[in-house]
Amino acid sequence: MKHLTEMVRQHKAGKTNGIYAVCSAHPLVLEAAIRYASANQTPLLIEATSNQVDQFGGYTGMTPADFRGFVCQLADSLNFPQDALILGGDHLGPNRWQNLPAAQAMANADDLIKSYVAAGFKKIHLDCSMSCQDDPIPLTDDIVAERAARLAKVAEETCREHFGEADLEYVIGTEVPVPGGAHETLSELAVTTPDAARATLEAHRHAFEKQGLNAIWPRIIALVVQPGVEFDHTNVIDYQPAKASALSQMVENYETLIFEAHSTDYQTPQSLRQLVIDHFAILKVGPALTFALREALFSLAAIEEELVPAKACSGLRQVQEDVMLDRPEYWQSHYHGDGNARRLARGYSYSDRVRYYWPDSQIDDAFAHLVRNLADSPIPLPLISQYLPLQYVKVRSGELQPTPRELIINHIQDILAQYHTACEGQ
């Protein structure tokens, strides 16, 4: 099941191929991704982050075993073969416990790694770049690498214990700024320098040797770097190949390594393709998929208001706004400005903090109410044309059923299609 190692081998042989990683726990996003991969007969890489899923439940309330069960059950229900499903863990390390002393945070990180590997996650991103309570800021490359090597050893031992062999594939390094989109308004972004990338690699190689892990180096398939792509609330910093050319050329000297690019959300299709050509061959996407989900839901809510008497409407938009105001912890430190600016950001920001609220029971009830209201009778074509024009074209051509669920799924798949095309290769 070495889909990733094989992808890297083909890329190194000149195929200019890649793979995208779906970073979301939302059932509709995952259904869209599984159905899209099934239709195109490709493997599917789904990743959970250390914030979403951990041994204590993360913000989704799921452990790694829970998440795997949830994804596999969904895949089975859609007849997607589990051997084409790759599960990854993203930013695994002391990320969740930076407020604790390093010894305690790393003990938790050991258990985090054990829980992911024991649950059958095969792509493991080791990220120990963050300073803990009693650490200097920033950490040296050597400390980061030593901690990553410690976690790699835990991962290897856990994998052998549970599966009889160590077949994990690793990603090392981190991007700047923090995961999940920038907090501040951006205008310019520093690209990782070749020297910094080399220093990260050599520090990790040395640390792995000290742990007796030389043999796993060929399974370290990717280094996370910053190719110069990012987004904030209303802007996207587009990939500029010229600025990343030295970095791109540097990785050509490493036989089994490519780059992994985070925060590729909202890049143009041309930029996504160029990133893969330039060896940033693992493209992470998350907020752009839940952003598309949100677009489709807001569009359907607008259609509902045209069709259904006000007192019978789901009120999805207002419920979402009320819940976000009642529980501001997921957006308050991200969205700034006056009341109107924050209101707009809650609904429309590229950073899509609303994604943390879809599982809320009130919002979920409003969503179910919306779908029921629109499923009772066919949605008039002119309203689909008005609010979901790309889906309207497919409905008219007969390739898409105009049901609420299918319209949502297809709108998300429009984003997945851009990533699929970027990763196909020659």
From Swiss-Prot:
Pathway: Carbohydrate metabolism; D-tagatose 6-phosphate degradation; D-glyceraldehyde 3-phosphate and glycerone phosphate from D-tagatose 6-phosphate: step 2/2. It comes from the Bacteria. One of its GO terms (cellular component) is plasma membrane. Coiled coil: none annotated. Pfam families: GatZ_KbaZ-like. GO terms for biological process: carbohydrate metabolic process; D-tagatose 6-phosphate catabolic process; phosphoenolpyruvate-dependent sugar phosphotransferase system. InterPro entries: Aldolase_TIM (IPR013785), GatZ/KbaZ-like (IPR012062), GatZ_KbaZ_carbometab (IPR050303), TagBP_ald_KbaZ (IPR023435). Forms a complex with KbaY. PANTHER family: D-TAGATOSE-1,6-BISPHOSPHATE ALDOLASE SUBUNIT KBAZ, N-ACETYLGALACTOSAMINE PERMEASE II COMPONENT-RELATED. NCBIfam families: agaZ_gatZ, PRK15458.1. Belongs to the GatZ/KbaZ family. KbaZ subfamily. Component of the tagatose-1,6-bisphosphate aldolase KbaYZ that is required for full activity and stability of the Y subunit. Could have a chaperone-like function for the proper and stable folding of KbaY. When expressed alone, KbaZ does not show any aldolase activity. This is D-tagatose-1,6-bisphosphate aldolase subunit KbaZ. It comes from Escherichia coli (strain 55989 / EAEC). The lineage of its organism: Bacteria, Pseudomonadati, Pseudomonadota, Gammaproteobacteria, Enterobacterales.
